[in-house]
C-alpha cells in the first residue's frame, strides 16, 4: 500500500452548521487532487451523509456536545476519508436487517426511511467500511482516474509496475 502524501485532520462540534465547513475542505482537497466536478459532488454527498449521521445519532443523549473527527488521506491514486465519532454506536448487521436489503436495481422509493445515507455512501464511493466500537467510524475511499464497469468493479486507467 502506498503511503499518504498528505494527511489532513479536522475536528468539529457535532452540530449541523459545521458539516458545510467539512464539505468545503473536502472540495478543496479533491479539486487540488484533480477529481472531476461530478466526483467532487459525489464525495461531498457521501461525506455529508457520514457527518450528518454522526451529528444526528451519536450524541443524541448528550445534546450534541461531542465532536466529529474527519481525516483525509491524500494518496497519488485515491482519497481516503475517515469520519469518526465517540458517541452511541449501533450494530451494523441489525441496522441493515432493519432497513432491509437494497441493491443498485432498487429505486430510491424502495429504500427504507433512514437507509438512504448508507446506500448513498456505498453507491457514490469505491469502498466503504463501517466500524462499530466506542463510537462509529466510517472509512470511505474514492479512486482517482478510474472508470466503473457495469458490474461495479473499478477499472484503473493507468498501468502499475
Swiss-Prot record:
The keyword Nucleotide-binding applies. InterPro entries: Anti-sigma-factor_SerPK, HATPase_C_sf, RsbW. This is Serine-protein kinase RsbW. PANTHER family: ANTI-SIGMA-F FACTOR RSBW-RELATED, SERINE-PROTEIN KINASE RSBW. Gene3D superfamilies: Histidine kinase-like ATPase, C-terminal domain (3.30.565.10). Keywords: ATP-binding, Kinase, Nucleotide-binding, Serine/threonine-protein kinase, Transferase. It holds the Pfam family HATPase_c_2. Belongs to the anti-sigma-factor family. Negative regulator of sigma-B activity. Phosphorylates and inactivates its specific antagonist protein, RsbV. Upon phosphorylation of RsbV, RsbW is released and binds to sigma-B, thereby blocking its ability to form an RNA polymerase holoenzyme (E-sigma-B). SUPFAM superfamilies: ATPase domain of HSP90 chaperone/DNA topoisomerase II/histidine kinase. HAMAP family: Anti_sigma_B. It comes from Bacillus licheniformis (strain ATCC 14580 / DSM 13 / JCM 2505 / CCUG 7422 / NBRC 12200 / NCIMB 9375 / NCTC 10341 / NRRL NRS-1264 / Gibson 46). It catalyses: L-seryl-[protein] + ATP = O-phospho-L-seryl-[protein] + ADP + H(+); L-threonyl-[protein] + ATP = O-phospho-L-threonyl-[protein] + ADP + H(+). Its EC number is 2.7.11.1. GO terms for molecular function: ATP binding; protein serine kinase activity; protein serine/threonine kinase activity; sigma factor antagonist activity. The gene is rsbW.
Amino acid at each position: 500500500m502506498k503511503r499518504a502524501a498528505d494527511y489532513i485532520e479536522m475536528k468539529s462540534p457535532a452540530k449541523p452548521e459545521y458539516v458545510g465547513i467539512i464539505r468545503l475542505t473536502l472540495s478543496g482537497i479533491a479539486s487540488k487532487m484533480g477529481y472531476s466536478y461530478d466526483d467532487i459532488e459525489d464525495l461531498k454527498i457521501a461525506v455529508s451523509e457520514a457527518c450528518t449521521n454522526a451529528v444526528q445519532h451519536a450524541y443524541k443523549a448528550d445534546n450534541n456536545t461531542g465532536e466529529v473527527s474527519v481525516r483525509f488521506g491524500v494518496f497519488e491514486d485515491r482519497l481516503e476519508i475517515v469520519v469518526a465519532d465517540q458517541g452511541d454506536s449501533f450494530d451494523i448487521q441489525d441496522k441493515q436487517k432493519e432497513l432491509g436489503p437494497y441493491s443498485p436495481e432498487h429505486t430510491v422509493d424502495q429504500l427504507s426511511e433512514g437507509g438512504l445515507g448508507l446506500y448513498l455512501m456505498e453507491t457514490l464511493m469505491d469502498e466503504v467500511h463501517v466500524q462499530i466500537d466506542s463510537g462509529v467510524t466510517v472509512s470511505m475511499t474514492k479512486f482517482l482516474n478510474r472508470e466503473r464497469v457495469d458490474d461495479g468493479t473499478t477499472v484503473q486507467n493507468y498501468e502499475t509496475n
